[in-house]
């Protein structure tokens, strides 16, 4: 161990303030803290955890002196250093614990500690009393737990409330979807932080390196820059390591890493660090030590409601919240029960401090070290047992019918559900019964109407209809249609529903008519083309019958023997009839004319130009169809027109003169 130099005692006399004044100054701090703590305890009944604060402070000082003397192992000349170090280390955590910046320290004390303790504290840091592994364990994520338990002059019961607050925060994160408890504590905590003006722990860290390097050299060299409590005394580090061995680190690590970022994020928006830094050198450093004594408890106490509220919610939440989560998963999500959540949180908070007071009065005679170890194990189960029995019973009595446990919903699902939605409608049973006989398909029982207007979705209505009632299919369709009018008044919905159904039927009929008309047009066009070219499907016997109907039965054999089918009628003309055996000229002219009329073609006149086609479009198409084969069998007139490029010469032109004047597009 490196020894502290003897010239260390001559430092504090530079500003003319003897060392003997410092214990007196510390005693004045204690007296002021006692007075203000007594006043604050009378104003805040929920802060009973912190009633033994003056006793615990004295006991901490009494127990801290031998430990610190034992650990530091100073020479006899270093007794003044021990007192100064104890004062500085005891004052700094008490001021910095709740997030109060270093603005209450005067410039004179800053200069003294910085000049006198710079070199010796570096040496003592090199000869640190703890091994580096233990110091790193204290400084890492668990430093929030140990510093809150030990360095704060407030008794260590506050740490329990902070730990329980962290567990509440974790459980509330899991229950965030259910909307049961998380929204209210965060809002109340934010309001409390805004009222008390608590600054974020990161702001206190910004002030430490510049103003108090001598006081926290041992701890700040070991701690990372983001730690919020850099001034941990040696005795508290030793005690924290002992408690760390008794308490497994798994309990502290998952709790505080989630709480401290949340606190810093909530408090960061209140006072930015740029505002606190100019206040420290200017006005706040000039305040007298009396103001320090009075402001210290006033600023440390406002954090207590934060811890108390978290404590109370922690004691109430473990099982009641799980019960609420099991009881109302669906009702809480469907119905906006913000008011019931507020009532639950208000019921939990005022009940728990009284029981905390009873349990705390029993535990007050114990010293702070014992209470710090016993409270998380003994007091918590008792308080939780009380609060788990009483709040659940009172909640079941005071909660409205909508938020009763699911057992009641299972027994009476039809009586509870219609009530909140039934209040939306201003129509009684008489009006509904009066309208029933007018419309036959609406004659239903009152219970079904209640259920139908109460049910929120079509699926539930269909389930209730399928399980409790038997309806025909068109009636269910009408109810599906009536879902559109379910948000209207029942008096208006019935009439408007009929109109809507009528309009829907008209619309459906009009759509059906349009579809039918379009289908008819298509079928007519197809039938027209089929009828127009029906003769293409004739066989030679059918053609022979058609010739006999024209008045030439004697030529039936000629058409049958030559296999003149409907497709080959295009070739039946005056030039080809003699080859078939018909030699009578008059008969040839009559048969040729009837064939053109059947095929709807016109033979060109002799005056036409030689560039015009031999046939018109239909004639050309029929000539193409006259060939036998797969392509000619599947060929249609529209396909032929597109393939031949005759779109400009559609068959709409039927006059023979115009047909004769069509230009030739195909050789």
UniProtKB/Swiss-Prot annotation:
This is Sterile alpha motif domain-containing protein 15. InterPro entries: SAM (IPR001660), SAM/pointed_sf (IPR013761). It comes from the Eukaryota. Transmembrane segments: none annotated. Residues 1-18, 268-277 have a biased composition (Acidic residues). Residues 19-53, 84-93, 187-196, 228-266, 284-314, 322-338, 346-364, 381-422 have a biased composition (Basic and acidic residues). Residues 538-601 form the SAM domain. The gene is SAMD15. SMART domains: SAM. Residues 1-108, 147-424 are annotated as: Disordered.
């Amino acid at each position: 161990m490196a020894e502290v130099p003897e010239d260390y005692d001559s430092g504090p006399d530079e500003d003319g303030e003897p060392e003997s004044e410092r214990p007196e100054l510390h005693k004045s701090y204690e007296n002021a803290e006692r007075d203000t703590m007594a006043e604050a305890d009378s104003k805040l009944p929920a802060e009973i955890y912190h009633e033994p604060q003056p006793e615990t402070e004295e006991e901490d000082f009494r127990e801290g002196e031998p430990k610190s003397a034992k650990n530091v192992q100073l020479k006899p000349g270093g007794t003044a250093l021990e007192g100064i170090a104890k004062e500085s280390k005891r004052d700094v955590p008490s001021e910095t614990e709740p997030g109060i910046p270093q603005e209450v320290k005067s410039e004179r004390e800053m200069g003294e500690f910085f000049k006198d303790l710079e070199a010796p504290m570096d040496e003592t840091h090199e000869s640190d009393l703890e091994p580096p592994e233990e110091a790193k364990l204290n400084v890492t994520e668990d430093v929030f737990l140990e510093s809150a338990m030990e360095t704060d002059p407030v008794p260590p019961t506050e740490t329990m409330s902070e730990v329980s607050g962290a567990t509440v925060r974790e459980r509330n994160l899991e229950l965030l979807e259910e909307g049961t408890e998380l929204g209210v504590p965060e809002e109340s905590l934010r309001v409390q932080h805004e009222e008390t003006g608590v600054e974020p722990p990161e702001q206190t860290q910004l002030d430490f390196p510049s103003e108090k390097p001598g006081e926290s050299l041992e701890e700040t060299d070991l701690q990372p820059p983001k730690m919020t409590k850099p001034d941990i005394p040696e005795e508290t580090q030793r005690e924290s390591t002992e408690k760390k061995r008794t308490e497994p680190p798994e309990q502290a690590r998952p709790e505080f890493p989630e709480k401290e970022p949340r606190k810093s994020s909530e408090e960061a928006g209140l006072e930015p660090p740029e505002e606190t830094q100019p206040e420290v050198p200017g006005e706040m450093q000039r305040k007298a030590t009396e103001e320090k004594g009075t402001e210290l408890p006033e600023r440390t106490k406002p954090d207590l409601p934060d811890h108390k509220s978290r404590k109370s919610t922690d004691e109430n939440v473990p099982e009641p919240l799980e019960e609420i989560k099991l009881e109302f998963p669906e009702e809480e999500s469907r119905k906006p029960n913000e008011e019931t959540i507020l009532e639950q949180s208000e019921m939990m908070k005022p009940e728990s401090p009284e029981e905390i007071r009873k349990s705390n009065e029993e535990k007050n005679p114990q010293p702070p070290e014992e209470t710090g170890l016993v409270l998380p194990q003994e007091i918590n189960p008792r308080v939780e047992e009380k609060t788990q029995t009483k709040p659940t019973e009172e909640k079941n009595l005071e909660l409205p019918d909508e938020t009763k446990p699911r057992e009641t919903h299972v027994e009476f699902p039809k009586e509870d559900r219609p009530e909140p939605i039934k209040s939306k409608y201003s129509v009684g049973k008489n009006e509904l019964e009066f309208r029933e006989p007018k419309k036959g398909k609406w004659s239903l029982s009152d219970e079904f109407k209640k259920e139908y207007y109460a049910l929120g979705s079509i699926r539930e209505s269909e389930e209730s209809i399928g399980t409790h009632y038997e309806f025909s299919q068109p009636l269910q369709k009408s109810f599906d249609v009536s879902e559109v009018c379910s948000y209207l008044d029942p008096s208006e919905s019935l009439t408007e529903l009929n109109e809507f159904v009528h309009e829907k039927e008209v619309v459906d009929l009009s759509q059906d008519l349009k579809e039918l008309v379009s289908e008819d047009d298509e079928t007519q066009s197809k039938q027209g083309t089929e009828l127009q070219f029906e003769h293409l499907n004739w066989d030679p016997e059918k053609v022979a019958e058609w010739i006999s109907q024209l008045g030439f039965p004697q030529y039936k054999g000629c058409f049958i023997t030559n296999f003149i089918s409907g497709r080959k009628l295009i070739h039946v003309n005056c030039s080809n009839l003699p080859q078939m055996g018909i030699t009578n000229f008059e008969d040839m002219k009559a048969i040729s004319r009837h064939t053109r009329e059947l095929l709807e073609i016109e033979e060109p006149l002799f005056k036409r130009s030689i560039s015009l086609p031999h046939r018109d479009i239909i004639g050309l198409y029929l000539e193409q169809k006259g060939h036998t084969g797969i392509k000619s069998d599947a060929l249609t007139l529209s396909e032929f027109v597109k393939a031949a490029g005759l779109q400009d010469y559609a068959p709409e032109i039927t006059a023979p003169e115009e047909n004769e004047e069509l230009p030739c597009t195909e050789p």
